[in-house]
Amino acid sequence: VSRARMTSPDPIDLAGRILEKVAELHAAGKKDAAAALRVEMTRDDPALFALVYLRRHLTDTETQRVTLSEVHLAWAEIARQWASSEPRRDAIIAPRSMGKSTWFFLALPMWAAAHGHARFVAAFANSAGQAQAHLMTFKRELDGNRLLREDYPGLTRPMMRRGRPLADSQDMYIAEGRFAFVARGADTGNLGLKIDDARPDLIVCDDLEPGEGSYSAYQAEQRLTTLLDDILPLNFRANVAIVGTTVMSGSIIDQFRKYHDEQEAAAVRNLDCGSSHVETVAL
């Protein structure tokens, strides 16, 4: 199977061909070669990683067909750049039921952790319970996903001390290979969050805001202060993905949208004035 980037015209087909080749290698008694193929083909390709290792999470429960849209490929392209030396910050705005949590709390951090592109993930949600539920899904894959356990034992086995897991709780997991995942509510005390001397190198915020019925402009301002003063300063060199849905006018996600629209309008005005310079803004 030839190497292909996630921009392959049909990543679902490519993943299927990889799995067929893996089955052939297993049938020939070449288990190590099968594992090496999976690892090598997914090293730089988050979408392919999800299709190979987390296929059931991308399968429609009614049709039993694997589903993948252009937006999922765009999200995978964002994550692929986490492997570079230059950190990036992105705000992703999407309606509900688009798979935001599946990709940003499971598939993309799992890919980054498996291939060493992230060593310490700090994940935040509106409440501690939400964040912990996502970490539980992540840990269930580590415990029960046969392919992950075969190919990435240093990720799937918890770090042990005196015969007991060092950190395998509702809000924290530390792997044998020293990867760490911490899940917190937005208003949980987060100042100075670090493990030994390590600070988060990937910060994910998913649905950081509650629904409009329990949210006000004052609360939005308070939550923005938490984001700017407590969460982002955990590591200014970390990759950051802030994912959410616009819950009301003036919410944090809505402010991202307005800022983006203003920058696009400014670029258009520059073109109208004959300027040759157009500035693009990464949220």
What are these model-predicted stretches?
Residues 87-108:
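Walker A/P-loop
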Residues 222-240:
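Substrate-engagement module of ASCE P-loop NTPases
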